[in-house]
From Swiss-Prot:
The modification N-acetylserine is found at S1. Gene3D superfamilies: Globins (1.10.490.10). Belongs to the globin family. This is Hemoglobin subunit alpha. It comes from Pseudaphritis urvillii (Congolli). O2 binds at H59. Residues 1-142 form the Globin domain.
Length: 142
């Protein structure tokens, strides 16, 4: 579980990341589709799956809006993300293993875009947070 220090570190890092959230999200989604091609199945309705395509950028923005919500609900992720969990489980039918894949891609992008801020401590805290988000999003699958 997230400690108070983890939460404070995530909130501080998010304060910097949020200014570039759309770019982070687009890069993370684009990276996921390229590095983990099995994830393309969820986006087969898009005419263009290239990393810089408008659909990838739009979905990246959507993902980061969800992360912003998670940061705001950091004290109760399970209830705070319940609606998103239901949407992913019942409407989109996303395999919850993909949450971890996208989380990893986000960590890579954030490390690349924010090397000064992405300290080992920040890395651990953000990784724990994204794991907690993945778990909360998996809630309705049970």
């Amino acid at each position: 579980s997230l400690t108070d220090k983890d939460k404070a570190t995530v909130k501080a890092l998010w304060g910097k990341i949020s200014k570039s959230a759309d770019a982070v999200g687009a890069d993370a989604v684009g990276r996921m589709i390229v590095v983990y091609p099995q994830t393309k199945t969820y986006f087969s309705h898009w005419p263009d799956l290239a990393p810089n395509s408008p659909h990838v950028k739009t979905h990246g923005k959507t993902v980061m809006t969800g992360i912003a919500l998670a940061v705001s609900k950091i004290d109760d992720l399970t209830n705070g993300l319940l609606e998103l969990s239901e949407e992913h489980a019942y409407k989109m039918r996303v395999d919850p293993a993909n949450f971890k894949i996208l989380s990893h891609c986000m960590l890579v992008v954030i490390a690349t875009m924010f090397p000064k801020e992405f300290t080992p401590e920040a890395h651990v805290c953000l990784d724990k947070f994204l794991c907690a988000v993945s778990l909360a999003l998996s809630e309705r699958y049970r």
